[in-house]
């Protein structure tokens, strides 16, 4: 959640402005990205006044303002309360972009990913259907992991 401008709007608008878009295009892309993550009401809020969940959503809006084909995320659900975690999952599931997510939050992975690549000691152990991999008790134990909660 790296934010460095003074307001949410300015942070989300940073990339479009640096891409040389007109101010009208910048405003359109920025507001569109804020709406996708449901934080348009925070556009004028100072970055330092945001909660952890709001910072995550602002960071995702910043990414979306660039209209990427692929989004890379490292532990996106860490330090989120249950409500913001569920909100993040719902947002990720609505995004059309390909998502590459590194996470130890196996329940979030179950809820958001069709395909999983399981790594251990920097090596690919298994690549395939998320549910098949994460519900394989023997594989998970061999990899030093536990089954997702509730399974």
Where are these regions (language model features)?
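Conserved ABC ATPase "signature" region
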Residues: 24-42
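Conserved ABC ATPase signature
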Residues: 46-50, 54
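Hydrophobic anchor residue at the start of the ABC signature
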Residues: 59-60, 88
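Catalytic Walker B motif of ABC-type/P-loop ATPase nucleotide-binding domains
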Residues: 71-74
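H-loop/switch region of ABC-family ATPase nucleotide-binding domains
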Residues: 103-104
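A short, surface-exposed alpha-helical micro-motif characterized by mixed small hydrophobic
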Residues: 109-111
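Conserved beta-strand-loop-alpha-helix hinge in the C-terminal portion
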Residues: 123-146
């Amino acid at each position: 959640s790296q934010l460095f401008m003074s307001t949410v709007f300015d942070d989300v608008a940073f990339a479009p402005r640096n891409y040389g878009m007109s101010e009208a295009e910048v405003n359109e892309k920025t507001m569109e990205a804020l709406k996708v993550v449901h934080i348009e009401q925070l556009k004028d809020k100072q970055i330092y006044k945001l909660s952890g969940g709001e910072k995550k959503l602002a960071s995702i809006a910043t990414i979306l303002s660039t209209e990427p084909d692929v989004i890379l995320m490292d532990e996106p659900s860490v330090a989120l309360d249950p409500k913001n975690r569920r909100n993040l999952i719902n947002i990720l599931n609505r995004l059309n972009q390909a998502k590459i997510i590194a996470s130890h939050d196996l329940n979030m992975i179950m809820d958001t990913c069709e395909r999983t690549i399981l790594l251990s000691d920097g090596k690919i152990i298994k690549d395939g259907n998320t549910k098949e991999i994460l519900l394989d008790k023997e594989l998970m134990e061999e990899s030093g992991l536990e089954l997702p909660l509730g399974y």
